Amino acid sequence: TPHPTPFEMETAAAFLYFKEEQCDVVLIEVGMGGREDATNIIPKSLVSVITSISMDHMKFLGNTLEEIAYQKSGIIKNNGLVVTAKQENCVMNVIENECCEKNARLIKADNVTEYEISLDGEYQRENAAVAEEVCRHIDGVSENDIKNGLINTVWHGRFEKICDKPEFIIDGAHNIDGAKRLKESIEKYYGNRKIVYITGVFEDKAYKRIAEITAPLAQKIYTITPNNPRALSNEKYASAISEYNQNVEAVSLDTCLLYTSPSPRDRTRS
């Protein structure tokens, strides 16, 4: 038997902890994919949740949306309940087929929430609609609980403003869908503003497509090399970006911060 991976051991430890703590409800996020993921060992769930599916982790999950959707839909349980976000037609077909095979009930949260939410970004309204629908199928959660939860949600690193002067937004977009959502949010909230773009990426991501989607939005781009063995070099990323925006410069993170930081008296945390 192969030795368990660190993630598998962490998952086992987490399940043991949840049992010892006698948790009422546990929210479990898949590590990668779903069908073959360690978290999918549980035989039954209150609800299986599938958020927006896009091209990511192709080395492990497949090279088409349908293949990735097949892996993701593996979390669907026999006779279970499934809530899914808005999906591409080809993805929804895979999810519907899996539900049919397992006699699972499918709810499509394909609108946006009507409640006020604390997070910027139109895609967050879509995410909130999914969360809203899930909560409606958990005993003891009222509409008022849902409303209060959405307005008080904090999600670091997702179109998060961390500074006012200048306005400094951080976002963890690392795949094609995330890049598209970031573009939508920038155009909606900062369409008439000068954008300075600081970016770094892992080499195993679809960085050329990410560059194609986001680079034209900026007046100036600085590329950095993330502190990670999987990192794409700043020079290589700058070369990819230059096809879509010539005003790009590969720098160190320290240099970049010197270029872009306001004076200390101007810094105000939001």
Model-derived features: where do they sit?
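Conserved catalytic-core segment of NTP-binding enzymes
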Residues: 35-36, 42-102
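Single conserved hydrophobic/aromatic residue that forms the stacking wall/gate
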Residues: 259-270
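Cofactor-binding loop segments of dinucleotide-utilizing enzymes, especially the Rossmann-like FAD-
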Residues: 52, 87, 199-202, 226, ...
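Phosphate/pyrophosphate-binding catalytic cores of soluble transferases and nucleic-acid-acting enzymes
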Residues: 2-12, 23, 75, 81-92, ...
